[in-house]
Amino acid sequence: MEERDIFRIEVTDADKGKRVDKFLVEKLRDRFSRAFLQRLIRDRNVLIDGEPRKNNDAVKPGEYVEVVVAAPAESDIMAEKIPLKIVYEDKDLLIVNKSAGMVVHPATGNYSGTLVNALLAHCKKKLSGIGGVRKPGIVHRLDKGTSGLLVVAKNDRAHRLLAGQFKAKTAKRVYVAVVKGVVQFDNGVIEAPLARDRKDRKKMAVDFDEQRSKSAITRYHVLERFKDATLVEVTLGTGRTHQVRVHMAHIGYPVMGDVTYGTRDGLKRPMLHAMTIGFIHPSTEKFVKFTSTPPRDMKELIEKKKRV
């Protein structure tokens, strides 16, 4: 059976009367291009109440629009010679300093320009297969807009041992972020369960419904306060999707530039950087740690805030 991804989006009162194609572009612009969405509609892969719809059909509040997208086959994922910032590499793994704007692995509607495409060119076939054809070598992810360190497994044994540490929460992951507002306390722990947003499946939200949510723990430490922003160090106790971004917004200090959970603030991406990663090496069985400094855009923002 063909593997598929299905996106189910609720139509709200604010969407009343919008054309199906325009509605989908608004809701899925971060994931798919306009041309790709229009092709899905033409191919009868956009449904309302189980019936295919046309571009100019109007949506109604209370309806659910379903978008059905075939997952990429192995042949769809090509090796691409994309420059990589490799911090460390051996026979078991490599540490990549991912640039902001790079997607980690191919997904529906986005098959090229990803970290996986670059890894296929760099490592040839020396990547773990546990993640499947779409995610070879990928042990954990970073959001598209997040820069920083990410570990990649080059064989299945390394993948299992590394993934086990992430699951057991023994791997060390530290982020640095510039958040909006002056954080009151020097240190804090945010314990708030997360689940898919009930109205927007692309987003996560704090949700105390035990049937839907998963526990999430984030610890933060203030590094420097500015007039209207704060530089914080954030350590993950769990590794949920969008965890840092949702938790910081939840306590009133959204990551600057995060248009999904805060405001754009005149920035091109969320000011969030995966600064440190540490784990037990699968072969040496010794703890190793890698650190990277924030990229230029974050450094420039920090210097700008210092001058205010």
Predicted regions: what they are:
Residues 1-189, 193, 198, 271, ...:
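RNA pseudouridine synthases
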Residues 49-55, 228-231, 263:
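Short alpha-helix capping/helix-loop boundary micro-motifs
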Residues 86, 179, 220-222, 255:
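Conserved hydrophobic positions within beta-strands
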